[in-house]
Swiss-Prot record:
Its EC number is 2.3.1.234. GO terms for molecular function: iron ion binding; N(6)-L-threonylcarbamoyladenine synthase activity. Its main location: cytoplasm. Fe cation binds at residues 115, 119, 304. GO terms for cellular component: cytoplasm. This is tRNA N6-adenosine threonylcarbamoyltransferase. It comes from Endomicrobium trichonymphae.
């Protein structure tokens, strides 16, 4: 089954052709980082405009890369999928309209996909050995969620962030340090040359809860910089390394404690922050020590992409069936992670 998927929830315009949920025949991603860098964050209006300007070309390229054109689209594509939320309202609308238009023209079923579902299953694209149930940690610019995935579309959300998401924490830390946007990749690169033990930032483990909180680490950095302003490259390297270490240890500790508590031997990471080199390293090493398999998507599938939407859509239609009469579906910017309904 070939699914043509579209993802426009935030600042990446992406389209992909996915066969049977696991074989990516094409994936095209247009990033808006350069557009938003000067504002040190995503500007919703600019994001929507960029999606409008690039969606047609991205769709054409994704189809072309898969050996499909608009003439044989009807024969080679079985269903359309799009990100229905959460995300920026205007951005979501662009992808939804594009997918609905194609579904109407070619009389194909339409599959709405939760963006978080995409991150949950992104590791399955390259790791077919992932078995259910598993513990999933979604870490991105807007989300930090710990979820037990009991079956496809059957979840138990253990905890989420009480304030800043992990990605937000990195972005805000970078701004305090005078670095550019997005902060996560920049801090990750600089930290490689630093000493992670130079500064002992707080680890907010929140005993008795599976929730996360990164405002404490952010405040600790702010207070440290008030009395220890950055004066040289070595100091900057050490601060970045120490901050990265604190975030990585917090995420890892919570995840493995949850896996132990719920007797789960598989942990799956997803979301843009899972691209962080130290987070990947710590999780893999801790997994080996605890006889727990850790699955992390490759970098292209860690950040927002339409292939993960196509993957989730395939398993969703297998469980819930296909619908041809849902063209009136509207995106939901605040869509929570929820169990699939038959």
């Amino acid at each position: 089954m070939n699914i043509f998927a579209i993802e426009t929830s935030c600042d990446e315009t992406s389209a992909s052709v996915v066969l049977n949920g696991l074989k990516v025949k094409s994936v095209v991603i247009y990033s808006q980082i350069k557009i938003h860098a000067g504002f040190f964050g995503v500007v919703p209006e600019l994001a929507s405009r960029s999606h409008i300007e690039n969606i047609n070309l991205v769709i054409w390229r994704a189809l072309s890369d898969a050996g499909i054109n608009f003439t044989d689209f009807s024969q080679k594509i079985d269903a359309l999928a799009f990100t229905s939320g959460p995300g920026l309202a205007g951005a979501l609308l662009v992808g939804a309209i594009a997918a609905k238009s194609l579904a109407c023209v070619y009389k194909k079923p339409l599959i709405p996909v939760n963006h978080l579902d995409g991150h949950l299953y992104s590791s399955l694209i390259e790791n077919r050995s992932v078995k259910l149930p598993f513990l999933s940690l979604i870490i991105s610019g807007g989300h930090t969620e710990l979820v037990v995935v009991e079956d496809f579309g059957k979840y138990k959300v253990l905890g989420s962030t009480r304030d800043d998401a992990a990605g937000e924490a990195f972005d805000k830390a970078a701004k305090m340090l005078g670095l550019s946007y997005p902060g996560g990749p920049i801090i990750d690169k600089i930290a490689e040359s630093g000493n992670p033990e130079a500064v002992r930032f707080t680890r907010p483990y929140l005993k008795g809860s599976w929730d996360f909180s990164f405002s404490g680490i952010k405040t600790a950095l702010l207070n440290y910089l008030k009395t220890n302003p950055v004066r040289n490259e070595k100091q900057l390297n050490d601060i970045c390394a120490s901050f990265r270490q604190a975030v990585a240890e917090t995420l890892c500790f919570k995840s493995f404690e949850a896996a132990k508590k719920f007797n789960l031997k598989r942990i799956v990471l997803g979301g843009g922050v899972s691209a962080n080199s130290l987070i990947r390293k710590i999780f893999l090493e801790t997994g080996q020590k605890n006889n727990t398999k850790v699955f992390i998507p490759s970098l292209i599938y860690s950040t927002d992409n339409a292939a993960m939407i196509g993957c989730a859509a395939y398993f969703k239609q297998k469980k819930c069936g296909l619908k041809y009469d849902n063209i009136q579906l509207k995106p939901n910017p605040s869509l929570p992670l929820e169990n699939w309904r038959l």
